A protein has these predicted regions:
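N-terminal accessory scaffold of Fe(II)-dependent oxygenases
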Residues: 1-180, 188-190
């Protein structure tokens, strides 16, 4: 925490904050008309303090800061932690949170996800599995991209029967600190 704070710009971040009842699952409300969390403008120190406060809780509230531009919010961080990609200067983002999970989604750019602390499991699906992932509303989304309506931790196969086919094509990897994964453009991931 202190290391990240040493680069803090002091600008507030957008955090997704939910009570313990959502069990870390950033998702829609029951009508699919809104969300099961609130957006809050918090400073990095506040987010990190909340994460530390609830670190050992068996049912913590959810705190999640997603896809936050490193150059804007953590100036100088990149000079000490960048990947040497020769002439390429990709956008560098950071995701910070506790036991939070975003439903399967895709990103337009190819991504490299690096695990700095804790563990992070990724489940990837090739783009041709879109038809088996049951995508939710495209005009109202929790984090920008459409997401799957399937709860991967407790799939309802009666409601989403083709999800079993998607799982047959899934690739799963668990990252630990120092590990990285390349996520190709348009591949669905969770």
């Amino acid at each position: 925490a202190d290391y990240l704070l040493s680069f803090d710009s002091g600008k507030p971040l957008t955090a997704m904050v939910g009570n313990a009842s959502i069990k870390g699952h950033i998702f829609y409300n029951s009508e699919l008309s809104g969300f099961n969390f609130d957006y809050q403008r918090l400073h990095l120190a506040e987010v990190l303090e909340q994460l530390a406060t609830h670190r050992d809780s068996s049912a913590p509230p959810t705190f999640y800061v997603g896809s936050t531009n490193v150059d804007h919010w953590l100036p100088g961080f990149r000079q000490h932690n960048d990947l040497n990609l020769t002439d390429h200067k990709p956008i560098a983002s950071v995701w910070i949170g506790n036991r939070s999970r975003i439903s399967a989604h895709y990103d337009f750019p190819t991504n490299i996800a690096c695990c700095a602390a804790g563990r992070r499991r990724f489940t990837l699906f090739p783009p041709d599995q879109l038809k088996n992932l049951y995508v939710g509303p495209i005009d109202v989304t929790p984090a920008g991209q459409p997401i799957s309506l399937v709860d991967f931790n407790d799939p309802d196969y009666r409601r989403f029967p083709k999800f079993r086919q998607a799982l047959e094509s899934a690739q799963v990897v668990e990252l630990e600190p120092g590990d990285a994964i390349l996520i190709p453009s348009m591949w669905w991931h969770y």
